[in-house]
């Protein structure tokens, strides 16, 4: 199941840097993190769902690249985001 519009708007409201912000790195990483967590739960139940596993790996790679970009350009924002999302970095 894809992320609902209400849930996505809730995540955007929490991580947006300013009014109307939907594309900042923080928002993108937060949405990807929610999707990754959701797919992890699905994979635990359906171990042979290889198509979903591939999609999960693509999302993890996308999040990794966005976090590397943020770390390179603004370490303080990177650390705040990692702490607020509870990621292991």
Curated annotation (Swiss-Prot):
Residue ranges annotated as coiled coil are none
What CDD domains would the database entry show? Ribosomal_S15p_S13e
Gene Ontology cellular-component terms listed: cytosolic small ribosomal subunit
PROSITE patterns to which the protein is assigned, alphabetical: RIBOSOMAL_S15
Q: Which domain of life is it from?
A: Bacteria
Q: Which keywords accompany this UniProt record?
A: Ribonucleoprotein, Ribosomal protein, RNA-binding, rRNA-binding
GO BP field: translation
- InterPro entries (alphabetical): Ribosomal_uS15 (IPR000589), Ribosomal_uS15_bac-type (IPR005290), uS15_NS1_RNA-bd_sf (IPR009068)
Q: Which SUPFAM superfamilies match?
A: S15/NS1 RNA-binding domain
Q: Which GO MF terms are attached to this record?
A: rRNA binding; structural constituent of ribosome
What assembly does the database describe for this protein?
Part of the 30S ribosomal subunit. Forms a bridge to the 50S subunit in the 70S ribosome, contacting the 23S rRNA.
What's the family? Belongs to the universal ribosomal protein uS15 family.
Job of this protein: One of the primary rRNA binding proteins, it binds directly to 16S rRNA where it helps nucleate assembly of the platform of the 30S subunit by binding and bridging several RNA helices of the 16S rRNA.
Q: Which PANTHER family match?
A: RIBOSOMAL PROTEIN S15, BACTERIAL AND ORGANELLAR (PTHR23321), SMALL RIBOSOMAL SUBUNIT PROTEIN US15M (PTHR23321:SF26)
HAMAP family linked: Ribosomal_uS15_B (MF_01343_B)
This one is known as Small ribosomal subunit protein uS15
Q: Which organism is it from?
A: Streptococcus gordonii (strain Challis / ATCC 35105 / BCRC 15272 / CH1 / DL1 / V288)
The gene designation is: rpsO
């Amino acid at each position: 199941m894809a992320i609902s519009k209400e849930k996505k708007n809730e995540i955007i409201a929490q991580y947006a840097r300013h009014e109307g912000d939907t594309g900042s790195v923080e928002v993108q990483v937060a949405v990807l993190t929610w999707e990754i967590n959701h797919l992890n739960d699905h994979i635990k139940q359906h171990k042979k769902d290889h198509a979903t596993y591939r999609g999960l790996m693509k999302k993890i790679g996308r999040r990794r690249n966005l976090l590397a970009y943020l770390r390179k350009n603004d370490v303080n924002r990177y650390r705040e985001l990692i702490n607020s999302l509870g990621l292991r970095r």
